[in-house]
Amino acid sequence: YTTLFRSCIQGNAFDGSSEPGIVWVMQDINGNGLPDDEWYELKGSEAGKKETIRNFEVTYYRPEGKKMDVQWISSDGRNGWVDYLSAYHTQDYYYPAWITENSYTLTGTCLASRNIQDSQTGYWDNQAYDWGYVDNFGNDQIEGGSTVDGSGQRNGFKISNAIHVDGTEEIGRA
C-alpha cells in the first residue's frame, strides 16, 4: 500500500480525532530556493463537492491581553472565537507570537465540518474524511497511530493530485 504514494506526512490522528489539513506543494521552477513559484493544492476526497469552499478567508484578531480568546471573522460572514483553554495549554494566548500586526488573514480551501459533540460527555468526535488530508484518520494511512494519542500516524500523498489555486487540474503530469 505504501508504494502507491510519493510522499507522506506524519500527524497524530486516531479514530474520532481527525484534524484534517490541506497540503500545498511548489516546485522551485526559477531555482532561487524561495517559495515564490506557483503553489498547487493536493486535492483530497472533498475536492469539487458543493460543501467545499475554495478561496475561503479567515481573519484572526490579536486579543487585548493574555489568556483571552482570539476573535475570527470569515469571508462568508461567519464569526466566532478560538477559546483559550488554560487547562490544556500554558502559552499566553493562541495568536501567533511571530505576527506583529493586530490581525492576519489565511486564505485557502474550507472543508465542511465533521465535528460532533457527545451530549453526555461533552467530548468532540472529529470524524475523518476519506483521503487526501494530513492528520486525518482516512483510508490513505501509511501507518496507523496509537489509539491513545495518534503518535506515529502518517497519511500518504500523490503529486498527481495537484490542482491549481482555482481548482483546475494540472495538465501533463506524470
Q: Which residues does each PLM region occupy?
A:
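Mid-length scaffold segments of soluble, non-membrane domains
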Residues: 16, 32-35
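Tryptophan-centered short beta-strand motifs
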Residues: 34-42
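Low-complexity, serine/threonine/proline-enriched polar segments
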Residues: 45-159
